[in-house]
Amino acid sequence: ELGLVGSEMCIRDSPTTIGAFAGIEQGDLYQPYQRLPAHPAHVAAGAVFEDFGAWKRPAYYPQGSEDEEAALAREAKAVRDSVGLLDYSPLGKLEVHGPDAREFLNRVYLNNIQTLKVGGCRYGLMLNEAGIVIDDGVIVCLAEDHFLLHTTSGGATTIHQHLEEWLQCEWVDLEVIVSNSTTQWATMMLSGPQARTVLQKLPCDIDLSREAFRHMQYREGNLCSQPCRILRASFTGEVSVSYTHLTLPTRRFV
């Protein structure tokens, strides 16, 4: 009987709203945003932002009455004809250390990592057990037992977990440590025929000449008196275009 199992006092006239369950986890509070180290500078430049995973990243910078298409066309032409700068800080950066680091990476990447020399870079494809591509990016050999992996911007955490699963559950005999340094380094990509010229105008103790710093090579040094990592890589394959990744400690970059 109803009187034995409950009370009509508990029956509401209307159902509970979904908002009551969600509480403050809605709108801007639903998911915390990650902002770039140079976020205030992008705002000052009039950037229109887009959601890229958890990151707020500039999509384009309109001038005057430009719409999105016009702004993107102007920016693309500037990179083709001269130079452009992209804040690429969300790019995933995982560091792999240990005496078995090279063997470990050779197992998880489709590419041959055994032949990658110190100071060299190589584009890599990461596959799952079914042979399906789950991520890609440039692999840098910092030392014989130290590698820097670049993942897709939204995949750093997922790939980090993927690597840890293999190390902790399958290949427990390998001596390898994986750390996520994505938010520790601000990354800028300088692109276009004048990229090298612009970079050479800044105080830098790295030889940036074409002969000393070739395609798919990596260097460490100081830029504007700050430690930096510089990588030469091309995303188009055009010889006339030089792509340079400038990576600096986040706090110093700000």
List each language-model region with its residue ranges.
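Acidic, proline/glycine-enriched N-terminal capping motif
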Residues: E8, R12-L127, I132-I134
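Short capping/connector residues at structural and topological boundaries
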Residues: Y60, E66, G84, L91, ...
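A residue-level structural signature of the nucleotidyltransferase/glycosyltransferase Rossmann-like core
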Residues: L2, K93, T187-M188
